[in-house]
Amino acid sequence: MLDEAIIKHNLPFNFVEYEGIRRVFSYLNLDVKQISKNTSKADVLKLYKKEKNDVKNKLKSIPSRICLTLDLWTPVTSERYICLTAHYVDENWKLKNIILNFCHMPPPHPRTLLLEKILNFLEEWGIVKKLFFITLYNASNNDNCQDFIKKKLNEGGLLLCDGIFFHVRCGAYILNLIV
């Protein structure tokens, strides 16, 4: 339960070592075994791995195909990140969106590095055989990236209709360019 509170409230791992928190735990139970920040970190990581495994199993069990959005994002700090989100319809016909990966992606973004990262994400989640389409920003490097991924997946016959529906351009990005 403590690991869930740390995640939910974005608390540091050493929260469990705060003197006031330790006193509260001791007050509630004199026999409590106090844990360290390393134990707290290990517990959070264990919970993450369990949740990730649950999501993997869920993605494997859904009857529908999975659509992806991929975003390369640069906040004001000039750090760069890559975000891969899965979208699917569950067995109750509810649209579900799950961020699968969000990680640091230092510049530059050469095509080979980006492709390797994306293909590793797909393999890691075990969804290569379930893809329907991917939405990317309109950029020439994204077109090249999408073409290569489509070619790679089509070699194994993994895409519907030979992948003609595989690349969907980002409508919001296009509208923003028009405005």
List the model feature ranges, each with a label:
Residues M1-V179:
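Short alpha-helical patches at protein termini and domain edges
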